[in-house]
């Protein structure tokens, strides 16, 4: 499992291990308050959903700028390599960043990443100087192929986007973390509760990226704070070292010094 103490992505250090999406909020104000409560250093946003070119009077864009967070544009909704590469290139020009959350969707039903298109697009973008953070499944071979083409971060899903199902395949996620020890890995998508984020961090994952679980909560800022606390707690638990599970009970109270008649 990852022994990295600092949260470092492409050579850049971050204080928070929480990456928050900016879509689906009922209002820009709720989004701003949620970003603040999340204590995040990175926010994701999609070029297709916003038009930052029109910045005058754009409340959304102004709030994003005021947050001071690093921008992580995404290629959400892209279904082909060409489409994803083109959108990434446009995002670099508009948002003035070479960071990109790469998404190539292969199925409309569960929004599962297209593994073949994802690897191809990642290779193209990395050759163009992009810092690619690929949204992928928990498939070990896919993750290895992404590393082979130059990705320095992996973002496997916990469950399909927006489902709130949590960590559906714990075996795969644990195996992935154990097999790929020294690469930052962020659980991206599918989480619905802070407890699920804490569990992922306890497994040794380096960070959490989510959107819907906060944006669709009854109180998004409070939920953002809850996730931030859970992520911190999960990381502390991982660093502390969890006890091993046992099949039999073991008393936690010592018997030394008890009266002799106790055993009669």
Swiss-Prot record:
Enzyme Commission number(s): 2.8.1.10
Residues at the catalytic site: 101
Subunit and interaction comment: Homotetramer. Forms heterodimers with either ThiH or ThiS.
CDD domains: ThiG
A GO cellular component entry from the record: cytoplasm
Species annotation: Cellvibrio japonicus (strain Ueda107)
Catalysed conversion reaction: [ThiS sulfur-carrier protein]-C-terminal-Gly-aminoethanethioate + 2-iminoacetate + 1-deoxy-D-xylulose 5-phosphate = [ThiS sulfur-carrier protein]-C-terminal Gly-Gly + 2-[(2R,5Z)-2-carboxy-4-methylthiazol-5(2H)-ylidene]ethyl phosphate + 2 H2O + H(+)
UniProtKB keywords: Cytoplasm, Schiff base, Thiamine biosynthesis, Transferase
GO molecular function annotation: thiazole synthase activity
Keyword Zinc-finger set for record: no
GO BP terms in the entry: thiamine diphosphate biosynthetic process
Location relative to the cell: Cytoplasm
Region (Disordered): 245-264
Function according to Swiss-Prot or TrEMBL: Catalyzes the rearrangement of 1-deoxy-D-xylulose 5-phosphate (DXP) to produce the thiazole phosphate moiety of thiamine. Sulfur is provided by the thiocarboxylate moiety of the carrier protein ThiS. In vitro, sulfur can be provided by H(2)S.
Origin superkingdom: Bacteria
The protein's name in its UniProt record: Thiazole synthase
Similarity comment: family membership: Belongs to the ThiG family.
Keyword Phosphoprotein: no
Chain residues that bind 1-deoxy-D-xylulose 5-phosphate: 162, 189-190, 211-212
Pathway recorded for this protein: Cofactor biosynthesis; thiamine diphosphate biosynthesis
Top enzyme category: transferase
Signal sequence segment: none
């Amino acid at each position: 499992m990852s022994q990295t103490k600092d949260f470092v992505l492409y050579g850049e250090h971050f204080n928070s291990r929480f990456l928050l999406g900016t879509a689906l909020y009922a209002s820009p104000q709720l989004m701003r308050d949620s970003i603040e409560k999340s204590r995040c250093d990175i926010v994701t946003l999609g070029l297709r959903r916003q038009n930052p070119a029109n910045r005058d009077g754009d409340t959304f864009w102004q709030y994003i700028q005021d947050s001071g967070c690093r921008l992580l544009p995404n290629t959400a909704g892209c279904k082909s390599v060409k489409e994803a590469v083109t959108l990434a290139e446009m995002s670099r020009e508009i948002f003035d960043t070479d960071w990109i959350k790469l998404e190539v969707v292969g199925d409309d039903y569960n929004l599962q990443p297209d593994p073949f298109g994802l690897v191809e697009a990642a290779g193209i973008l990395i050759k163009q100087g992009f810092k690619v953070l690929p949204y992928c499944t928990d498939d070990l071979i896919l993750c290895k192929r992404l590393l082979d083409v130059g990705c320095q971060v992996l973002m496997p899903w916990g469950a399909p986007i927006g489902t709130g199902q949590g960590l559906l395949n714990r075996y795969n996620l644990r195996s992935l973390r154990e097999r790929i020890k020294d690469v930052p890995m962020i659980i991206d998508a599918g989480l619905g509760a802070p407890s699920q984020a804490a569990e992922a961090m306890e497994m040794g994952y380096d960070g959490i990226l989510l959107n819907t679980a906060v944006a669709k909560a009854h109180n998004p800022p409070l939920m953002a704070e809850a996730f931030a606390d859970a992520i911190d707690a999960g990381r502390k638990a991982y660093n502390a070292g969890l006890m091993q599970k046992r099949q039999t009970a073991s008393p936690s109270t010592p018997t030394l010094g008890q009266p002799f008649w106790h055993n009669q």
